[in-house]
């Protein structure tokens, strides 16, 4: 996990300033949130539906509803969602969750997603998603979108897409498919 943490943190860290607060929605064990807080000197809070036995000791918000983030409006500078949206079975509900993230963010939402570029990528996406998540009981509905589809969906639904970038992660998937970062800035 350490190699994956470092790769994810390298993508997210430039978008979080020292002293800012961030909420990691879908934080899992909190390993990435802890590492990101350490690197950026920011204050992390974890948020997830599932209680993990090995969850890192961070401030924690327990979700009881997958479509609602249990926090007040604009209560964190930044909201982070790492590989969360493709675990939501209905595409419409993915937008609800993204809107919830923006509701609690003062500045921006950082979304990292698996984004297959072609059919071969999609096959590897599905295989790795199943291998990495099935044993934890995490939903795996395979609701992936391409980078262009996500950018269009975000833009057409009122989000301001300030930055996007794609890369092939080395860990844990050995660069078999793409991840994309979307920086969604608060309007106004």
List each language-model region with its residue ranges.
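Conserved alpha-helix/loop element of class I SAM-dependent methyltransferases that forms part
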Residues: 2-18
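A short, conserved alpha-helix within the catalytic core of class I
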Residues: 88-100
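C-terminal alpha-helical "lid/dimerization" subdomain adjacent to the S-adenosyl-L-methionine
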Residues: 112-171
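Class I SAM-dependent methyltransferase SAM/SAH-binding core
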Residues: 29-68
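A conserved beta-strand element that flanks and buttresses the S-adenosyl-L-methionine
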Residues: 80
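Short catalytic micro-motifs in class I SAM-dependent methyltransferases
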Residues: 83-87
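Conserved class I S-adenosyl-L-methionine
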Residues: 20-28
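Core SAM-dependent methyltransferase catalytic element
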Residues: 170-188
């Amino acid at each position: 996990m350490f190699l994956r943490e470092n790769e994810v943190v390298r993508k997210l860290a430039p978008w979080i300033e020292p002293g800012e607060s961030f909420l990691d929605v879908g934080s899992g064990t909190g390993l990435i949130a802890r590492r990101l807080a350490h690197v950026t000197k920011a204050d992390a809070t974890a948020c997830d539906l599932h209680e993990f036995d090995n969850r890192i000791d961070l401030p924690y918000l327990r979700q009881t509803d997958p479509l609602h983030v249990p926090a007040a409006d604009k209560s964190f500078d930044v909201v982070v969602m790492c590989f969360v949206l493709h675990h939501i079975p209905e595409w419409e509900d993915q937008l609800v969750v993204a809107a919830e993230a923006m509701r609690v963010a003062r500045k921006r939402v950082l979304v990292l997603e698996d984004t297959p570029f072609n059919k071969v990528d999609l096959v590897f996406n599905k295989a790795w998603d199943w291998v990495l998540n099935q044993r934890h009981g995490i939903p795996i509905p395979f609701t992936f979108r391409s980078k262009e589809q996500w950018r269009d969906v975000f833009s057409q639904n009122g989000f301001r897409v300030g930055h996007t970038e794609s890369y092939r992660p080395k860990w844990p998937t050995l660069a078999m498919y793409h991840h994309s970062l979307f920086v969604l800035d608060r309007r106004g």
